[in-house]
């Protein structure tokens, strides 16, 4: 949950969280918008019962029938580079396809961190796209990290240190390029 002066944004709803709306209301009394890093049920499952709208990358609409079949709310679309203004605090929407075609990272430039869902740092690399797309995504995110001096990306799961550093994103570029070139196999 990211809170500004006038609004709050919940990044991912998790799954099987009973009374998520009440839990969020116990933290903030501001209006809350739900955004998803991607549409897998471990990130959107609790949205079904508690949120009338969810904002996603339009590239992930292909996954709605499989991963969100019971969601009856309104699906709204984010745009790459969009600024979500919470009043005194903003998040930038950065499309980061890789884990899914519509994976998205939300960057808080002022705080120098981002929320990457399963795009970076979630402990394993389950690709929903090809390696060339992953390389493009990593290069794009690396440029955003450098431009805004982002210190960490916080992933959607806890496996180990639970944050991704700029160097590890660069390492993903090298690893992916080495796999594509045949330098690394296995």
How would you label these PLM feature ranges?
Residues 1-7, 17, 26, 48, ...:
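Zn-dependent metallo-beta-lactamase
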Residues 15-86, 178:
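Active-site HxH/HxHxD metal-binding segment of metal-dependent hydrolases
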